[in-house]
Amino acid sequence: MKTRLALPCLLGSLLLSSAVHAASALVPPKGYYAALEIRKGEAQACQAVPEPYTGELVFRSKYEGSDSARSTLNKKAEKAFRAKTKPITEIERGVSRMVMRYMEKGRLRRAGMRPGLLDAWAEDDALLSTEYNHTGKSMRKWALGSLAGAYLRLKFSTSQPLAAYPEQAKRIEAWFAKVGDQVIKDWSDLPLKQINNHSYWAAWSVMAAGVATNRRPLFDWAVEQFHIAAKQVDPRGFLANELKRRQRALAYHNYSLPPLMMIAAFAQANGVDLRGDNDGALGRLAGNVLAGVEDPEPFAERAGEDQDMEDLETDAKFSWLEPYCALYACSPALRERKAEMGPFKNFRLGGDVTRIFDPQEKPSKSTVGNAD
């Protein structure tokens, strides 16, 4: 008798996977098709489902009280922000962690396992409040990218781990689509002076949702936002709106790269090559950031302040190197450096980025890197 596979807890109620996609269907990069590693053994304990967040998306900014550079952390405001957004970050991290664990150590079905994390949030239309501030709409788009990004690994796996859940499928897809539509409303038609890394992360989240639900309008919107971002990269590889962050300008240039690289990788998988936009803006931006890590003086000159390098000492901040080296011919030295820094796990990109783009890299335990 053939044993049937299913998710342990978490996404026991996700989308029905299909092994066959129509020619026009949106697809992710090839690493998302990886099969499960099936090992018999004791199943992981179920994680408690965070209460679906259906309230107003109005949160204090951790930079509250800072000047226009928005670069000075307000510890009291940050504490309040972390406390109020805890259910959202818990589901982001929880889904990412469990998907990584499941893909790496697929377990046989444990009898009686209840439906998992996302179904409850979809059922309650979580994260869809139209009452929000800037920090609130930022949380919405980050969460969508995290959840849809992790889900993609399950949907497109050749092992089809979600095939047992057709009823929940419609609910989850509809929810992703609705949140994606709202993110588009949140971040469309902004003046250029307000388009920065937040818009890039919004575009990544919509790209992930678009491919997860096979909705071309979401894909197209994400690509259009990439075009806008590419036009913002100057001839030397600087982003004017990130230079405004003064002492954190280099850190925010680096923070802009993960969503842009992911969008480019997903576009490439669907026959759209974005590397040539604005005379190779994406590669130029990446090269400038890598040079800045070695010598931050050019950033200090342009931003008007010495650069705070603390964020850049965290290897997880360079998770964009995985899609970068899949899109470009990275030098042997950079590939060696990437291997030393990795494996990269970033829950805001859906989890284990290395396993997707460089699967021969030796995997490590399923911890989720910091993303903010």
UniProtKB/Swiss-Prot annotation:
Catalyzes the depolymerization of alginate by cleaving the beta-1,4 glycosidic bond between two adjacent sugar residues via a beta-elimination mechanism. Degrades deacetylated polymannuronate alginate more efficiently than non-deacetylated polyM. Is able to degrade its own alginate, but at a lower efficiency than that produced from M.pyriferia and P.aeruginosa. May serve to degrade mislocalized alginate that is trapped in the periplasmic space. Optimum temperature is 30 degrees Celsius. Its EC number is 4.2.2.3. Its main location: periplasm. The gene is algL. Monovalent cations such as potassium and sodium enhance activity, as well as a combined action of these cations with magnesium. However, other cations like calcium, cobalt, manganese and zinc, or the presence of EDTA, do not affect the enzymatic activity. GO terms for biological process: alginic acid catabolic process. Transmembrane segments: none annotated. This is Alginate lyase. Optimum pH is 7.5. Residues 1-22 form the signal peptide. It comes from Azotobacter chroococcum mcd 1.
